[in-house]
């Protein structure tokens, strides 16, 4: 597959998440997805990715992600993203604040056989917690 095809897979991955169509995730993500621990208590793999997204949707029902930059080389695609939503539900033990948040992240996806097989990501959790008003720095 070409680099442009790899980037197209990552764009599709993000579209599926933004539509909250987790059943469609298997179109672009391997069932055996390798990830580091996504969130405490969440398993790795495609089911863990789905569970982590459900946690975000519980806390932020209007949760969306925008791809700000997309780079690819070989079998890897890197995305710089901005995530946003309004905290109207409980989120990881934090009661709803009603606050709109916007925070950034970056991830690298490795593509094989037309699917994401590995995913590494980092988000600005400090900014998220500051905007929710639960972390003062």
List each language-model region with its residue ranges.
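C-terminal and inter-domain tail/linker signature
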Residues: 1-137
């Amino acid at each position: 597959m070409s680099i442009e095809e790899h980037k197209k897979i990552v764009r599709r991955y993000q579209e599926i998440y933004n539509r909250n169509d987790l059943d469609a995730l298997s179109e672009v993500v391997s069932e055996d997805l390798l990830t580091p621990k996504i969130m405490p208590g969440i398993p790795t793999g495609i089911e863990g990715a789905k569970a982590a997204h459900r946690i975000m949707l519980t806390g932020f029902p209007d949760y969306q992600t925008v791809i700000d930059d997309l780079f690819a080389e070989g079998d890897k695609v890197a995305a710089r993203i901005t995530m946003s939503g309004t905290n109207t539900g409980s989120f990881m033990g934090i009661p709803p604040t009603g606050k709109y948040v916007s925070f950034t992240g970056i991830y690298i996806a490795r593509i094989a056989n037309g699917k994401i097989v590995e995913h590494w990501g980092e988000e600005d959790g400090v900014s998220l917690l500051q905007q929710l008003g639960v972390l003062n720095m």
